[in-house]
Amino acid sequence: MESVGNNDANRDELIIQQQREIEKEISDSTPLVSGQLPLTCLREEYNGDEIFTEKIRELSKKYKFIRRTRPDGNCFFRAFAYSYLEYLITNNTAYQEFKILAEASKDKLVQLGFPSFTLEDFHETFMDVIKRVNPTNSEENEKVKNELHTVFNEQGYSDYVVVYLRLITSGKLQEDADFYQNFIEGDFSIEEFRHQEVEPMYKESDHIHIIALCTALGVGVRVEYLDRGEGDQVKAHDFPEGSEPKVYLIYRPGHYDILYPN
Amino acid sequence: MSTPARRRLMRDFKRLQEDPPTGVSGAPTDNNIMIWNAVIFGPHDTPFEDGTFKLTIEFTEEYPNKPPTVRFVSKVFHPNVYADGGICLDILQNRWSPTYDVSAILTSIQSLLSDPNPNSPANSTAAQLYKENRREYEKRVKACVEQSFID
């Protein structure tokens, strides 16, 4: 059989190489996080599509701006981190609380069995980023927000923040494995799911990632779902249910961006 | 210039020197920290015992967010090793985690030598012999162990 003969060629590397070329094309054309754009800019993408045009009109009653993130599979984590830190810049008390929680998170992950040697590297960078967006006083807010934007567009920092949030998510799934097992489809164990769908970079996020991360950090997130679903309203969902949202995201099939409520 | 990848590789190297796992070793090449040479000693109580298998590890600036490319330089007869030395191992592909370091990579490859996965073969002959004719499999492995002394 021909397939047996082909087996010995190194297909994995060819596939990986092809993937990398596609990724490079995306990264050359879109920033990791864009500037604030008027929400109405979405219309252009769905020109002539009635359902979407109507839903965007409804959405623009509640939200003025959108901030795009690069569609690289890390968009949920990057959007979440950016949006939450941006909120913390305006709320010093919450910022200080989060800093303590973030500082303590490393020991918790080590206890859960993550290798402390490599964890340290990500944690240090994560804390660096948090310290760089320290809200000094309200007059300086704009300056700190610019700093946040700069940091999140530096690949090294930006990606390490994503890695660390992925590890926190993975840790939460492990800690409450009995609960999260219910969300997993198929024969995946929590262990397999964490290693295949959570920890590797560029793997897209699902509800289970969002719930685990929000719960671990105690942060409410509202996601607006812009899709072809019924009605002319965009459906919103809060994670964890009943929480007060601090982070607002828009989901279009396969991708998350940041929203700014009126 | 120090980049996150280079900084991390320096840390990996330091850890590998200070706390070396049994049966593996590795170090950056003289003039390029992005390319490493490594050696895995065949695990005891396996047909690979006594072999010294050389590998190269090539990192990109995206390490540790993306796995490096790891390749045997020595000839290795194994169900999950391609003819060109490439390795079919999930943690080097879709199960890569940024928490793995060089030490973890090398020890994982070492255990792959002891426990092949014949269901995702990179060398169909080796996979078939491993499943159906263990004696012949071990003979072929031992031949590459002897070869590894000379390489």
Curated annotation (Swiss-Prot), chain B:
Chief location bin: nucleus
Entry's localization field: Nucleus
Location of the active site: C88 (glycyl thioester intermediate)
Domain UBC core: 4-150
InterPro entries: Ub_conjugating_enzyme, UBQ-conjugat_E2_core, UBQ-conjugating_AS, UBQ-conjugating_enzyme/RWD
UniProt entry tagged with the keyword Iron-sulfur: no
Mutant lacking the gene: phenotype: Lethality during the second instar-early third instar larval stages. Mutants show defective synaptic function as a consequence of mitochondrial failure.
Pathway the protein takes part in: Protein modification; protein ubiquitination
MF terms in GO: ATP binding; p53 binding; protein domain specific binding; ubiquitin conjugating enzyme activity; ubiquitin-protein transferase activity
GO cellular component: cytoplasm; HULC complex; nucleus
EC assignment: 2.3.2.23
Gene Ontology BP term (one): negative regulation of intrinsic apoptotic signaling pathway in response to DNA damage by p53 class mediator
Record keywords: ATP-binding, DNA damage, DNA repair, Nucleotide-binding, Nucleus, Transferase, Ubl conjugation pathway
UniProt cross-references to Pfam families, sorted A to Z: UQ_con
Reactions catalysed, as given in the entry: S-ubiquitinyl-[E1 ubiquitin-activating enzyme]-L-cysteine + [E2 ubiquitin-conjugating enzyme]-L-cysteine = [E1 ubiquitin-activating enzyme]-L-cysteine + S-ubiquitinyl-[E2 ubiquitin-conjugating enzyme]-L-cysteine
Record's function text: E2 ubiquitin-conjugating enzyme that accepts ubiquitin from the ubiquitin-activating enzyme E1 and transfers it to a E3 ubiquitin-protein ligase. Required for postreplication repair of UV-damaged DNA. Involved in the negative regulation of the Ras/MAPK signaling pathway in the wing by acting with the putative E3 ligases poe, Kcmf1 and Ufd4 to mediate the ubiquitination and proteasomal degradation of rl/MAPK. Required for in mitophagy.
Record-stated family: Belongs to the ubiquitin-conjugating enzyme family.
Annotated protein name in UniProt: Ubiquitin-conjugating enzyme E2-17 kDa
Source species of the chain: Drosophila melanogaster (Fruit fly)
